[in-house]
Amino acid sequence: MNDQLVIVSPFTLVPPLGLFASLAQGHKLYFDGAEHYVKQTIRNRYHILSANGMQTMTINVVGQKGEKIPTKNILIDYDEPWIRLHKRALESSYRSSPFFDHYYPKVIGLFETKHANFGDLFRESFKLWTGLLKFEPDYLISDDYIELDSDYDLRSRIKSPEQFPADFHSKKYLQVFSDRFDFQPNLSILDLLFNEGPAALSVLKG
């Protein structure tokens, strides 16, 4: 293993593979719940591979009207039909994947629990992803703003998976629609789980 790096990340509900690759490769990850929420980022967005290419999925939150609010306190907006839209998109994109039937009910169960705020949903979602991976990574979740010398501070650096440091990309694996598209790196953890199942962690380790 390379020397352990220190990485600071915002709360992200359905993380890109780069986050889990960094953990699987032995690095230390700090999740900051007190940093001010930033719209249209990996905090509440994730990417899947659909029949038309990469598709962005958004977990709706209650608008803040210019206020600066800690990410952990942001409210999830269940008045918007995002759960139904995500169910439809995941079914359409991954129904033919090898492990869809095994993981899909757990993913939708997480969404349908309807945790009120971002912090609670993040904690439960991260517990689910690590549980499905059968993985106990080195991480810390903080409700206070994190100020430390880090090798990578992703809070202001990363808005989309394409911007994730290349150091933490997983190795290639067989994706749905591989007959139409080249391999799409750093999609959400769902893409890897649906396609690789129990082998997902070994893919992340590279």
What spans do the regions from the language model cover?
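Residues lining hydrophobic/aromatic ligand-binding pockets adjacent to catalytic sites
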Residues: 1-206
